[in-house]
Amino acid sequence: MAKKSMIARDVKRKKIVERYAAKRAALMEAFNAAKDPMQRLEIHRKIQALPRNSAPNRIRNRCWATGKPRGVYRDFGLCRNQLRERAHKGELPGVVKSSW
């Protein structure tokens, strides 16, 4: 189990990303459309003025059952240990043990 403070920090980041998503997208669109270097610099400064945690790449992909940050399968949102346990118990529909 991950530290509760790390899980809480990630939840906080998700909320901040959601809050600033529209503003960040509009600034990025304007930045990509701008041709003048000075105009691009001005827009870049506005992007840098946004909170650091409002960038979506700062969100860590975590297991929803344990909060572990590593070995997480995107399709299930589970870490490899939980995926294995739940697959053996039959709690994941459509997941079967492979044999060939």
UniProtKB/Swiss-Prot annotation:
One of its GO terms (biological process) is translation. Transmembrane segments: none annotated. Keywords: Ribonucleoprotein, Ribosomal protein, RNA-binding, rRNA-binding. InterPro entries: Ribosomal_uS14, Ribosomal_uS14_bac/plastid, Ribosomal_uS14_CS. Pfam families: Ribosomal_S14. GO terms for molecular function: rRNA binding; structural constituent of ribosome. The keyword rRNA-binding applies. Gene3D superfamilies: 1.10.287.1480. One of its GO terms (cellular component) is small ribosomal subunit. Binds 16S rRNA, required for the assembly of 30S particles and may also be responsible for determining the conformation of the 16S rRNA at the A site. Part of the 30S ribosomal subunit. Contacts proteins S3 and S10. PANTHER family: 30S RIBOSOMAL PROTEIN S14 (PTHR19836), SMALL RIBOSOMAL SUBUNIT PROTEIN US14M (PTHR19836:SF19). Belongs to the universal ribosomal protein uS14 family. This is Small ribosomal subunit protein uS14. It comes from Prochlorococcus marinus (strain MIT 9313). The lineage of its organism: Bacteria, Bacillati, Cyanobacteriota, Cyanophyceae, Synechococcales. The gene is rpsN.
